[in-house]
Amino acid sequence: GLLASLGKVFGGYLAEKLKPK
């Protein structure tokens, strides 16, 4: 659903933000 899609996108965004370059 929409929430699941948003959660996946937000989770990926957080992972990229927190992941050391």
UniProtKB/Swiss-Prot annotation:
Expressed by the skin dorsal glands. The keyword Secreted applies. Its main location: secreted. One of its GO terms (biological process) is negative regulation of nitric-oxide synthase activity. GO terms for cellular component: extracellular region. It is found in: Secreted. GO terms for molecular function: nitric-oxide synthase regulator activity. Keywords: Amphibian defense peptide, Secreted. Has no antimicrobial activity. Strongly inhibits the formation of NO by neuronal nitric oxide synthase at micromolar concentrations. This is Dahlein-5.6. It comes from Ranoidea dahlii.
